[in-house]
C-alpha cells in the first residue's frame, strides 16, 4: 500500500530555500546575509553534481519507474528546473539590488573593471602580470577537433579573437585556476575595494594572444556529474580504483552550464558545444557566477559590526582544569554539545592517548577530517611512539576521496594499520577506542559522536559527543572494530546498535512499541532530531504510530519526505526545521517507553542510505544527567519561535513567530547561554572550594 510521500529532491530544494530565506532577512547583520547566500550557492553546486547528475543518468537509461512520491526521473528534472529558475532569480536579485549596494555603503565595494580609476587600473595590471598571468593556460577551440577539457566548477573566460591582419575569427578558453583568490584588491585605504578575478582576466585577455584582437569575452562555469561510484566487486586495489573515480569525474557529463544573462550569441553557441551542455541544464544569471565564492567576503577583517556577536565555545564543567581526559572520563560519562562546548576535549582525548605511556592501542574511524588535522597528527605520533594504531579511513566519502587517500598514506608510512572501509558499504560511524593499562589491567575508553573528527567543522556544526569508559561500551567498540577490520559480523552487541544490521529493526521496534502503548491508553511520545527523513519504512511506522495516537515531534533540518497535516496518516506528527548560525547536525532520538525513556545519539539519519547501505552506530545514553540534558535539547527546538519553520503538507515551510504576548525563544542562543552559564557556575564553585597546603 502506498503512503503519502514528498519527493526527496523537491524537499531538499525547500531546505535550500529556508537557507536563502536567512539571506533575505533584513534584520540579520549584512555579512551574515552574504554568508547564507554563499551557502545556498555551494549547496546547489553539490546538489547538481550528485542528485541532478544521478537523475540525468536515470533518464538516459530510459528508466520511467516513479519514486515513492510518484514522480519519474523526467518529471523530477522538469520540476527541479522550474524551481531552480525561481531560486536563481531570487539569489541574484538579492545580491545585485540589496547586498551589493548595502556593502558599498558599508565600505566594501565591488568595482566594475570598466570603471577603474587610473590608480586602480595600475593595481589590476600589476596583479595580473605578477600573480595571475603566469598561472593561466589558454586553450584553443578548433572546429572539427576534440574540444578542450573544461574543468568542473572553475571559472572560465571564453574569448572571441580576431586576427589583426586577416580578421579571421577564432575562439579560446582561459580557465582560472582554483588556487587564485576570487577578489583582486584595488583598495586605496578607504574601506575595501576589489575587482573579481574573472573581470581582471577578461580585461587583460588580449595580452595572452599577441598579434590578435580579443573582440568579446564572457565568463562561464560548468558542473559535471559527481555521482560516480567505485566498482567494488571488481576492485582488488580500492585506492587505485578511487583514483580512477576521481579522474572519471573530470570527464563526466555536464549537468549544468552557467552563463551571463547578457552574452553574445556566437560565444554562447561555442561554449555550449565545447561543454556538451543540454539546453535544460543551461542557466543564465544576472550577476557574477559562483556566488559560493563570496563566502570569504563574510570574513573580511575590520567589519565586526556587520557580523553576529561572537559565541565562543565553552569548557565542559565535567572536565577539571589540569585533569587528563582519562581522569575526567574515569569519574563519569562526559557529554559534550558542540560547538557551544568546545571540541577540544575530543582532540585532547586522542592527543593524550598518543603521548600517554600507559596507552596500548588506538582504533578510530575517519570519514571527513580538517585540512590541517590535529587528530591525524596525533595518530601519526601515536604510531611513531610504538602504539598499536588502527584507522579505518573511508575512501568513499564523496568529494573527500583525494584527501582521505593522502591521509591514509601518511598514517601508513608512520606505521598505522590502515583499512579502506568496508566492501559495499560506506563506514560513517563516529567512534574512537583507546585501550589503556591501569593497575595491571586493560581499560577501554571510547568516544562516540554524531559528527566528524574535524576540528574545523566542529566550530560550525552542532553535534553531540559522548566520552565513556563503561565496560559494555568498550566491549562493543572492540566488537565493532573486529568486525570492520576482520571481515566478521556485527553481532552480540550489548549496548551499541549498528547499521546496517540492527539499527533499522531496533528503530521500527521502538516506534511500534510507542504505538502499542498509545493503543492501550498509555502516554506515548517520540522526539527525534535528524538531518534528513527519507526512509519509507520509518515513515510508514511513524504514520502508524500517529494513527495510534503517539505524540510525535520531529526536528528535521533538511530533506523531509514525510507528509505533514494528513488527517489520516500524520495527525499527531509535528515537524520543524531550524536554520540558524550553526548547521544543525546532531542526531538525537527519544522514546517515552512507559516513563522509562530510551534516549540515543546516532551517526545516522533516517534515510535508506544510512540505515541500509552504511556502517553506522546508534548509542544509548545511560548517564542520568546526560539523558535529562538531551531531552531538554530536544524540547528546546520545539520552543524555538524565531529560527524554526513548520513543515507544511506540500513540503514547503512557514517560519514560526512568537504568538501575541509570547517571548522570543531561539534554541541556539539558549544553548550558548546555557553552556556559558554552566562554565561560569563551575568556575565559581571551584573558586569557593578551599584546598589546604599540606606538609610533604
Indicate residue ranges for each PLM-predicted region.
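N-terminal localization/anchoring segments of enzymes in phospholipid and broader phosphate metabolism
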Residues: 1-526, 535, 544-548, 560-582, ...
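Cofactor-pocket helix-loop regions in the catalytic cores of large enzyme subunits
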Residues: 531
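Polyanion-binding catalytic cores of nucleic-acid enzymes and NTP/SAM-utilizing transferases
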Residues: 538
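Hydrophobic alpha/beta core scaffold segments
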Residues: 551-555
Amino acid at each position: 500500500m502506498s503512503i503519502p510521500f514528498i519527493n526527496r529532491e523537491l524537499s531538499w530544494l525547500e531546505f535550500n530555500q529556508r537557507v536563502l530565506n536567512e539571506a533575505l532577512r533584513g534584520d540579520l547583520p549584512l555579512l551574515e546575509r552574504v554568508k547564507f547566500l554563499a551557502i545556498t550557492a555551494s549547496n546547489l553546486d553539490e546538489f547538481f553534481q550528485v542528485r541532478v547528475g544521478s537523475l540525468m543518468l536515470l533518464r538516459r537509461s530510459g528508466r520511467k519507474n516513479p519514486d515513492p512520491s510518484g514522480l519519474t526521473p523526467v518529471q523530477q528534472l522538469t520540476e527541479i528546473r522550474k524551481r531552480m529558475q525561481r531560486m536563481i532569480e531570487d539569489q541574484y536579485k538579492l545580491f545585485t539590488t540589496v547586498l551589493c549596494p548595502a556593502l558599498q555603503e558599508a565600505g566594501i565595494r565591488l568595482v566594475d573593471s570598466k570603471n577603474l580609476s587610473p590608480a586602480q587600473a595600475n593595481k589590476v595590471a600589476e596583479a595580473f602580470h605578477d600573480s595571475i598571468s603566469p598561472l593561466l593556460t589558454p586553450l584553443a577551440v578548433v572546429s572539427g577537433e576534440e574540444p578542450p577539457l573544461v574543468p568542473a566548477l572553475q571559472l572560465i573566460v571564453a574569448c572571441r579573437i580576431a586576427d589583426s591582419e586577416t580578421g579571421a575569427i577564432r575562439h579560446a578558453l582561459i580557465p582560472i585556476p582554483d588556487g587564485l583568490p576570487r577578489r583582486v584588491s584595488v583598495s586605496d585605504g578607504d574601506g575595501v575595494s576589489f575587482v573579481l578575478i574573472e573581470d581582471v582576466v577578461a580585461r587583460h585577455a588580449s595580452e595572452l594572444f599577441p598579434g590578435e584582437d580579443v573582440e568579446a569575452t564572457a565568463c562561464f562555469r560548468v558542473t559535471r556529474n559527481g555521482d560516480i561510484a567505485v566498482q567494488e566487486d571488481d576492485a582488488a586495489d580500492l585506492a587505485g580504483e578511487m583514483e580512477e573515480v576521481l579522474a572519471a569525474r573530470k570527464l563526466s557529463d555536464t549537468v549544468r552550464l552557467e552563463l551571463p544573462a547578457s552574452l553574445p550569441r556566437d560565444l554562447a553557441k561555442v561554449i555550449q558545444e565545447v561543454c556538451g551542455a543540454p539546453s535544460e541544464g543551461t542557466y543564465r544569471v544576472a550577476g557574477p557566477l559562483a556566488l559560493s565564492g563570496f563566502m570569504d567576503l563574510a570574513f573580511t577583517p575590520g567589519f565586526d559590526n556587520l557580523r553576529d556577536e561572537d559565541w565562543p565555545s565553552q569548557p565542559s564543567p565535567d572536565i577539571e582544569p589540569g585533569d587528563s581526559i582519562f581522569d575526567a572520563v574515569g569519574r563519569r560519562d562526559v557529554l559534550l554539545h558542540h560547538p557551544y562546548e568546545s571540541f577540544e576535549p575530543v582532540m585532547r582525548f586522542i592527543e593524550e592517548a598518543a603521548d600517554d605511556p600507559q596507552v596500548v592501542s588506538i582504533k578510530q574511524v575517519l570519514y571527513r577530517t580538517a585540512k590541517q588535522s590535529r587528530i591525524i597528527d596525533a595518530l601519526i605520533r601515536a604510531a611513531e611512539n610504538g602504539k598499536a594504531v588502527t584507522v579505518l579511513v573511508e575512501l568513499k566519502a564523496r568529494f573527500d576521496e583525494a584527501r582521505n587517500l593522502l591521509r591514509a598514506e601518511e598514517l601508513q608510512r608512520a606505521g598505522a594499520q590502515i583499512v579502506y572501509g568496508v566492501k559495499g558499504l560506506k563506514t560513517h560511524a563516529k567512534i574512537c577506542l583507546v585501550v589503556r593499562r591501569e593497575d595491571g589491567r586493560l581499560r577501554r575508553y571510547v568516544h562516540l559522536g554524531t559528527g566528524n573528527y574535524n576540528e574545523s567543522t566542529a566550530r560550525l556544526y552542532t553535534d553531540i559527543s559522548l566520552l565513556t569508559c563503561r565496560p559494555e561500551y568498550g566491549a562493543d567498540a572492540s566488537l565493532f572494530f573486529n568486525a570492520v577490520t576482520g571481515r566478521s559480523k556485527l553481532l552480540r552487541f550489548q549496548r551499541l546498535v549498528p547499521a546496517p544490521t540492527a539499527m533499522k529493526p531496533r528503530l521500527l521496534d521502538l516506534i511500534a512499541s510507542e504505538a502499542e502503548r498509545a493503543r492501550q491508553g498509555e502516554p506515548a511520545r517520540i522526539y527525534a532530531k535528524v538531518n534528513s527523513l527519507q526512509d519509507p519504512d520509518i515513515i510508514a511506522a511513524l504514520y502508524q504510530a500517529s494513527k495510534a495516537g503517539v505524540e510525535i515531534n520531529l526536528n528535521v533540518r533538511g530533506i523531509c519526505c514525510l507528509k505533514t497535516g494528513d488527517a489520516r496518516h500524520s495527525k499527531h506528527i509535528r515537524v520543524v526545521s531550524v536554520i540558524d548560525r550553526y548547521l544543525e547536525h546532531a542526531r538525537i532520538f527519544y522514546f517515552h517507553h512507559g516513563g522509562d525513556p530510551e534516549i540515543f545519539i546516532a551517526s545516522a539519519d533516517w534515510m535508506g542510505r544510512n540505515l541500509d547501505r552504511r556502517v553506522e552506530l546508534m548509542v544509548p545514553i545511560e548517564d542520568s544527567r546526560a539523558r535529562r540534558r538531551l531531552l531538554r535539547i530536544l524540547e528546546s527546538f520545539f520552543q524555538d519561535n524565531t529560527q524554526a519553520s513548520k513543515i507544511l503538507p506540500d513540503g514547503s515551510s512557514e517560519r514560526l513567530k512568537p504568538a501575541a504576548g509570547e517571548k522570543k525563544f531561539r534554541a541556539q542562543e539558549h544553548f550558548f547561554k546555557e553552556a556559558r552559564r554552566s562554565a561560569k557556575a563551575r568556575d565559581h564553585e571551584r573558586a569557593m572550594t578551599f584546598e589546604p597546603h599540606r606538609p610533604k
